[in-house]
Amino acid sequence: MATATSIAQTLQTVPYVDLKKYAGKWYEIASFPQLFQKGCHCTTAEYTLTDKGYVTVENRCNKDSINGKQSYIKGKAFVDENSGNAKLKVQFFWPFKGKYWIIELADDYSYVVIGHPNKKYLWILSRTPKMDGTLYQQIISRTKEKGFDVSKIKTTQQK
């Protein structure tokens, strides 16, 4: 029998993601700080569909300040079968792949919340560099309900 604790710990994804609508540029609004993003400002991610069975991922940021030197990395995202396109594995360095789960997505694809089943990784992305404060707080509340430690969230400076 499942306990309330084990149910609360199971991370759910959205049922379906239309990758054509998802493709394009996203702005990082907030995230759990990661070593590989240290010193990043104005962080963006751009997803492009390919005919090769994966999505290209290009992450960019300005290092050390909003006007700092731009840094970027390219990778590939592979969709997990039978996930409704909501679970991907992202690879920036072969052979390593990281889980990329879409756990919340606006109906109009204006924002997305990406997490990892271990709840140590979290990103809130938007199609615009700024997000309405009320919407942001609602997202934070829902993220907390999903079992993420929201005290770790850091907002991302955007121009």
Predicted regions and their residues:
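A beta-rich soluble binding module of mature secreted/lumenal proteins
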Residues: 1-159
